[in-house]
Structure formats: C-alpha cells, structure tokens
UniProtKB/Swiss-Prot annotation:
InterPro entries reported in the protein's UniProt record: Cyt_P450, Cyt_P450_B, Cyt_P450_CS, Cyt_P450_sf
Region (Disordered): 444-467
Name of this chain's protein: Cytochrome P450 BJ-3 homolog
Cofactors (names): heme
Length: 467
C-alpha cells in the first residue's frame, strides 16, 4: 500500500502490517488508518481500532459492551483451537478471563506483583545489568561490534525471569528460545507451519512448568512460583496446576520479548537524541519519563492479540461493529494519535515527567501496557528493568553508536529486532543516528550511510524535528 498515493480503501490491515514497508516503518500506514479507516474491518472479519479514544474505551469497557470469548465458543474466534495447544493456553490466561473468574485469579497473583515486591528485585536486576555490560566491554574496547540485542536486550529479561521463577538460568535460556515462535503462531494471520512451531515450543514450556511446580511443592523457595503454589485467599481458594502453568506461560510470553524490544528502542533513542540524554542523568523521575516516552513512541506489541467480543451492535466513527464481532486494538497507532499526544512523532520525555506511570502531563494514557482490568501485570517489572539499564549503559559506554544497519524481525505483531550491532566510536568519528531512523528511515549523520531498500547508498536526512 503506497501512502503517497490517494487511497480509498485497505482490504486487510493485518496483512498490510506484515508487508516489508510496514516492517520498516508502520507509522505512515497507521496514520492513514486513523484518518481514513479508524474502525477497520479486515478480510477475516476482525475489526481493528486505531484511534486513541476508541482504543481506551474498548479496553476499559466491560459488561454490556465487550467481553472475552467464552470457553465453549473458542473455536469461533480461533478456528484452529481444537488442535492447537498454544491457542488453548492463550484462552486459559488471565488476559482472556472476565469477572468473576478474572477477579479471583488477579487477586491471587497481584500481591506478588506489587511495586514493593518488584522493587525488591532491583538489586538483582542491577547486578545482572552490570554483569552483561562487563561481558560486552572487552570486545567494544577492542573496537569490535557487539550485538546489543542478543548480548543485552534478550539476555536481561531471561536472567530476571529465571530469578523471578526460581529456576536455573540455562533452563530459562532454553525456554526463551521458543517465545518468538509462539508469539508468531498466535498472530491472526499465522500459517499452519507457524502454529505448529508455536505448539512445539508451548509443549516444551508446559512440560517444564509442570515439573517446576512439582519441585516447588516439595522444596519451596522464595520465588514467585513457590509463592503462587501456596497462594490462597481468605476462602482458602488456591490456584490449580493448570491455572499455574497457563499463568507462567502467559507471564513469560507477555514480559520477555516485549521488554527486550523496548530495551532496543530505548538504546536507539539514546543514540538518536543525544540532547535528551540528560533525562537519564538526573533524578528517577527523569529516567521514568524517558522510559514512558520510549514505550509510547514504539509500542513493542503493535496490536492486541486478545479478542474483545462485541456484546451488541456498537457504532464507532460511523461504523457499526456487529454483535459477536472480534475486535482488536492497534496500540501503536493510538500511542501516536495527535488527538491524544501533541506532535506525536516527536520524542519528548517531558510529556511524562512528574506524572503517574503511563499518564502524560495532559492526562492521556500511554497504551503499551493496556488499560482497564486487563492492564499488564508485569508493567512495573518491565519499567524497573529499563530504569536500571539505561543510565548504566550511558555511563559505561558514553560513546556507543550503531555499527551497521540493525535488522528488524519481520513480524506484524512485535516491533523488534534480529540484531542491533553497536560499537564505541573513536574521537572525531561520531556518527549519530537520526530521529528518523527510529521511524523506519535508515541512516546516520556524520558522513556515514546505510544501504536503502532500492540498493542506493546515501546519507540520511532527518524527517522529524529534533527537540
């Protein structure tokens, strides 16, 4: 779809998001959707909302407006659910439950994800960050390139989840290798081979977590799995093994790849906006503001994988969504809606300085962690990992720069990378990423250039105004 041409319709936004142009830079297409087709009906019959106000309303609305799929109708919204372990595990996660089941499960687990409990992990997270940076330092100091995506962004959440779950680090690294396959298999447009790969990875994860739960019953330690094994409320209600497995599966899927992607984008933002690094050198509120703006500018999960089912005919922006329709929300488009965030393509941490987490100074919600009762349970854990990482990366490697063109993962769902090569630049050799790079235009300033899709090599120009 050429956004330069006058376009009157888009047959399927999900297919367009998987196109090479959108993998490179999805935001022109998302802008077109907001302006011309904000309540989009895809070829599959799914509806996709792209305006901030509509997304907030859909995520918050419960009861008479939207619900999750009931167990008996799973096949209606996931046609391959009868034979797919991954889709059945997804259906059993907290994100797919509605009150009162959701209320019960959230109550049993939420005490272990309080800000105090997550903050208690800060010393361990800081230790992991320091160790990973120590491991990268020798190669960087020799002038070599290091893949920050694999050596740091992927490794840190693996180490944190191993600590959180009380399991060996090598075991976590093994499980984490299959997360990307599972996420792609859960996409609305996943092929049969993709779903088969997802199910194989889910089977390994399910078997491991089943064994882990049994070990925690025999030898409980001070970790979240042992705590959840013994979790109960005042009525002595406990979590079943099946509920525990789906919860651990969902936590790992929801908090690993997304955190890694945000670390990548945060480091790129540091490099693209050197005049904004002061946010990482002052008080904690400045670091938090920088993190929130990274999450707003590049939501790691671009749209919701969880269906919201219309309880009745609903009219939005002049479009009628019929009863029982499957509605998804395009989070990344809502985060860049000019009706919610002034000058939305501008990287400006000031819009979140001194506010409650996820809330702009104008009172608008950053949508990357969701909204309403299904707000991401691991949001604070992700924020702490970012807050502990970014100031340390900047202090340890102040001359860090990209070594070559980063490689994006060809995913319509996750905005992430396959590789992010970095190096230390020598005195007088200081290429700088343009802000446009973060939005898909490739290149650096300072005389360096990268190859564009047409094969021509040229220096980049910044199409976004720098703060």
């Amino acid at each position: 779809m050429d956004m330069q041409e006058t376009t009157t319709a888009c047959a399927d936004a999900f297919a367009e998001l998987a196109s090479p142009a959108c993998i490179d830079d999805p935001y022109p297409f998302m802008r077109w959707l907001r302006e011309h087709d904000p309540v989009h009906r895809a070829a599959s019959g799914l509806f996709l909302l792209s305006r901030h106000a509509d997304i907030c309303w859909a995520l918050k609305a419960t009861g008479d407006a939207f619900r999750g799929p009931a167990p008996g109708e799973l096949a209606r919204y996931f046609p391959r659910a009868a034979t797919s372990l991954s889709l059945n595990l997804l259906a059993s996660t907290l994100a797919m439950k509605e009150p009162p089941t959701h209320t019960r499960l959230r109550r049993l687990i939420s005490r272990d994800f309080t800000m105090r409990e997550i903050d208690n992990l800060r010393p361990s997270i800081a230790r992991f960050v320091a160790a990973r940076l120590d491991g990268m330092a020798p190669a960087l100091e020799r002038g070599e390139a290091v893949d920050l995506h694999r050596q740091f962004a992927l490794a840190l959440p693996m180490l944190v989840f191993a600590e959180l779950f009380g399991m060996p680090q090598d075991d976590m690294f093994g499980l984490a290798a299959g997360i990307g396959a599972i996420l792609e298999g859960l996409s609305p447009h996943a092929s049969d081979p993709q779903l088969a790969a997802a199910d194989a990875a889910s089977a390994r994860m399910k078997a491991y977590f089943g064994d882990l739960i049994q070990r925690k019953c025999i030898d409980p330690r001070h970790d979240i799995v042992a705590t959840l094994v013994g979790a109960h409320d005042d009525d002595a209600d406990t979590l079943s093994d099946a509920e525990l497995i789906s919860m651990l599966w969902g936590m790992l899927l929801g908090g690993f790849a997304t955190t890694a992607a945000t670390i990548d984008h945060a480091v790129l933002a540091m490099l693209a906006y050197p005049d904004q690094r002061h946010w990482l050198q002052g008080d904690a509120a400045g670091v938090e503001a920088f993190v929130e703006e990274v999450l707003r500018c590049d939501a790691p999960a671009m749209f919701s994988s969880i269906p919201r089912i219309a309880q009745s005919d609903i009219e939005l922006s002049g479009v009628v969504i019929p009863k029982n329709a499957d509605v998804r929300v395009l989070i990344a488009a809502g985060n860049r809606d000019p009706d919610a965030f002034a000058d939305p393509d501008r990287f400006d941490p000031a819009r979140f300085y001194g506010t409650s987490p996820g809330m702009s100074t104008d009172g608008k919600i950053m949508l990357s962690f969701g909204h309403g009762i299904h707000f991401c349970l691991g949001a604070q854990l992700a924020r702490v990992q970012l807050a502990e990482s970014l100031p340390r990366i900047q202090a340890r490697f102040p001359t860090l720069t990209v070594a070559e063109q980063p490689t994006r993962e060809p995913s319509a769902f996750l905005r992430t990378f396959r590789a992010l090569p970095v190096r230390l630049h020598a005195q007088g050799d200081s290429p700088r990423l343009t802000s446009a790079f973060l939005n898909g235009q490739r290149g650096v300033e300072g005389g360096a250039s990268f190859e564009h899709g047409d094969g021509e090599r040229r220096s980049a120009t910044d199409r976004r105004a720098q703060p």
